[in-house]
């Protein structure tokens, strides 16, 4: 419980930075031209122009100049050819939507069946509460997938408006971290029940489980606020499409803010929970090694949880940090392709979580016949 409180406190500290961005210029002409790095857009004619030859020691190499951001919010951006190439690529318009269609077809019925099974369960109230919240989070994610599917199939052209874009983005990221934290709460709950049974017996099971889930929803909502506050929908001039979250205004959402925000998100939302889960289930396996059937059941559950973390959550968070560090320190978005693929893998948890419920329910039933 103390660890969860520490996590909650850490999640509330969002870094505040000053809007600042750099533009990469490699042209040898007398004046710099507007060159926007992939997936970061900029308004037209908002950059200070001066002869590069005036820079002392300039030899024609790549130079970074400071952007002059407009005071008012804008909705139209200019991007480079690499960004447009990605937005029109088969990866973005065919492969990614195909994966999302598969997730929708499997995830919606799987989570509905899980909720139905949970509604019929009369014992192990903690298990019911945790998996109900997990299934609700996964189902919310799945029902927003048609918007993402239509977006990608339409050539990354968003037609559903700014509000829907922000909601979809919040649900997309929020589902992953909600699932991670709920799985962590489940691990803590099983650890207390097995390693400290007398302490666990004194706890009000229903209230304790609902409190933990409530904390998870509040923390995830607070950490998703930047996606709610910052503009996510931008119209691209040259390609005549409107993107949702794929292109951001470097002035409104500076690279320094994005870097520290996503690093803290990966640290508090993935790394710490992963360490807690490893500790809890390792202790459980050690405690139950003399009970063969229960021990084997926990081995299956732990392996499935490790699969979910290894395939779904680890690549997404690792590449997320590297991607934003790459842009923050080197002003390049070259890893965004890999990051989007990792996000697709991260979405698989919405289909794997229902299987985890059926495994865990058997283990709990063996512990409490």
From Swiss-Prot:
Q: What protein am I looking at?
A: Proteinase-activated receptor 3
Gene it is expressed from: F2rl2
- Residues on the membrane's Extracellular side span 38-93, 148-166, 230-259, 322-335
Q: How does this protein sit in the membrane?
A: Multi-pass membrane protein
The scientific name of the source species is Mus musculus (Mouse)
Which locations, inside or outside the cell, does it occupy?
A: Cell membrane
Q: Which residues lie on this side of the membrane: Cytoplasmic?
A: 120-127, 189-205, 280-296, 361-369
Disulfide bond entries:
165-244
Q: Which residues cross the membrane?
A: 94-119, 128-147, 167-188, 206-229, 260-279, 297-321, 336-360
Q: Which top-rank group of organisms is this from?
A: Eukaryota
């Amino acid at each position: 419980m103390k660890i969860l409180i520490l996590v909650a406190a850490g999640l509330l500290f969002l870094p505040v930075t000053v809007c600042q961005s750099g533009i990469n210029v490699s042209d040898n002409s007398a004046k710099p031209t507007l060159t926007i790095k992939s997936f970061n857009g900029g308004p037209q004619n908002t950059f200070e122009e001066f002869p590069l030859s005036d820079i002392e020691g300039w030899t024609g190499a790549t130079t970074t100049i400071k952007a002059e951001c407009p005071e008012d919010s804008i909705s139209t951006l200019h991007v480079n050819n690499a960004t447009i190439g990605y937005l029109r690529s088969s990866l973005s318009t065919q492969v990614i939507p195909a994966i999302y269609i598969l997730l929708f077809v499997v995830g919606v019925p799987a989570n509905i069946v899980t909720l139905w099974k949970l509604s019929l369960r009369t014992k192990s109230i903690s298990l019911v509460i945790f998996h109900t919240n997990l299934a609700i989070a996964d189902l919310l994610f799945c029902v927003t997938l048609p918007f993402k599917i239509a977006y990608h199939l339409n050539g990354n052209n968003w037609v559903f408006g700014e509000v829907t874009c922000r909601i979809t983005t919040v649900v997309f990221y929020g589902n992953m971290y909600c699932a991670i934290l709920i799985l962590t709460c489940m691990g803590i709950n099983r650890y207390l029940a097995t390693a400290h049974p007398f302490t666990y017996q004194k706890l009000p099971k229903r209230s304790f489980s609902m409190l933990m889930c409530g904390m998870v929803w509040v923390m995830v909502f607070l950490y998703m606020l930047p996606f709610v506050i910052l503009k996510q929908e931008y119209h691209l001039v040259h390609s005549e499409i409107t993107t949702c979250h794929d292109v951001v205004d470097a002035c409104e959402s500076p690279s320094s803010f994005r870097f520290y925000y996503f690093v803290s998100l990966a640290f508090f939302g993935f790394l710490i929970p992963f360490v807690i889960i490893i500790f809890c289930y390792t202790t459980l396996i050690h405690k139950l090694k003399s009970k063969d059937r229960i021990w084997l059941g926990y081995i299956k559950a732990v392996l499935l949880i490790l699969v979910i973390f290894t395939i779904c959550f680890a690549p997404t968070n690792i590449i997320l940090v590297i991607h934003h560090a790459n842009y923050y320190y080197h002003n390049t978005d070259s890893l965004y392709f890999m990051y989007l693929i990792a996000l697709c893998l991260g979405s698989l948890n919405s289909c794997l979580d229902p299987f985890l419920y059926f495994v865990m329910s058997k283990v709990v039933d063996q512990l409490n016949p």
